Amino acid sequence: MSAEAAAIAAHAVVLQSDARALTECAERLHEIEARLEAGGLAPPWLREAVNAHLVACVAAAADLTTAAAHLRRYAERARS
């Protein structure tokens, strides 16, 4: 494997790791959102803020997963 292909593949691994971290963050935010909803005491703006961050984490995780897949394919082509 060329050094360039190895570097590209390494970036893909980092992006996928970041995507997993964001997915885990979204899961934690979902749990927080459920507890806030069940408690019924949190102001609507707090639930909305938590939900906005949850949605952002999900979107970012999807984007990073897509970027990692593109980098993996690019690394494969760079190896040839």
Q: Residue locations for each model-derived region?
A:
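N-terminal secretion-targeting helices of virulence/extracellular proteins
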Residues: 1-80
